[in-house]
Design a protein with these regions (language model features):
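Short, Lys/Arg-enriched N-terminal segments with co-localized hydrophobic residues
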Residues: 1-8
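Gly/Pro-rich turn-and-neighbor structural signature
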Residues: 41, 48-98, 209-245
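A short, hydrophobic, proline-anchored segment that marks a local hinge/packing element in signaling
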Residues: 110-120, 128
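Gly/Pro-rich active-site capping loops and adjacent beta-alpha segments
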Residues: 123-180
Length: 245
């Protein structure tokens, strides 16, 4: 049985299903926004991007039908981000960008945009999307450097940096990032597309909380995690005896 996390469960199964599907729809919408708004064919045509939602601790609660190697690091990214940027530094309207492999895996061109979501001044979730930028600087165009002997040859390493706040874009910080990349105009369009996806996701979550109340939505988060745990335990029990790697 899943561990008792001390959280109330939603009383009505229909409410859980509505919330569940609202979360899934929000993650799907994020990916559509990036594809329709970005300038790079790598995003608009190839769809090399992914989107997800986590709770305030970085536990995955919903994801788009995107790329598994991206989706597998979303929760880890938020948890590692919070080790570097404490919650008391986060504000409504912030969107942080990062690409460090040690803060979410993947390679440098996979740039993540992360937005904390607040309801009534309380941090309740994160919206996060990942987009493969067609160039992240480095020794060669496209930023694939097979002969690299160190990570610095592969491109710009973006530690968590806030590029947007409630006041709008931080042009100085954005210009610093773009000055280190090839194809500045295209990269800028991709960057703003990622911001737009997080912005819409935050509004969708706030609407969901306003409609059902924080206690109910957060209880649904807990129920989703409990269901995932039960399903994983059932899958493990179904494995035949033996050694597994």
């Amino acid at each position: 049985q899943p561990a008792d996390r001390g959280q109330p469960m939603t009383r009505h199964p229909a409410t859980l299903e509505v919330v569940r599907n609202a979360l899934y729809a929000t993650a799907e919408e994020m990916s559509v926004i990036v594809m329709r708004s970005a300038r790079s064919p790598l995003l608009k045509e190839a769809g090399d991007l992914s989107s997800a939602l986590t709770d305030a601790e970085g536990r995955l609660i919903a994801q788009g039908r995107d790329i598994p190697i991206h989706l597998g690091v979303m929760g880890f990214t938020v948890k590692e981000f919070l080790k570097r940027v404490p919650k008391d530094r986060l504000r409504e309207g912030d969107v942080w960008f990062l690409n460090l492999p040690e803060v979410g895996g993947n390679h440098l061109p996979d740039v993540k945009a992360l937005r904390p979501v607040f309801v009534g001044g309380r941090l309740v979730a994160f919206a996060i999307n990942l987009a493969h930028w067609a160039d992240i600087g480095g020794a060669v165009p496209g930023s694939y450097v097979p002969w690299a002997t160190e990570c610095y040859q592969e491109g710009l390493r973006i530690a968590p940096i806030r590029l947007f706040s409630a006041e709008g874009p931080d042009r100085h910080a954005i210009d610093f990032v773009l000055a280190n990349l090839r194809g500045r105009d295209e990269r800028e369009g991709d960057l703003f597309a990622q911001f737009a996806a997080d912005d819409v996701a935050a509004r969708r979550l706030q609407e969901l909380f306003a409609h059902y109340g924080a206690d109910t939505v957060l209880a649904c988060f807990e129920r989703l995690h409990a269901e995932s745990e039960m399903q994983m335990r059932a899958a493990l029990r179904a494995l035949p005896d033996g050694a597994w790697e």
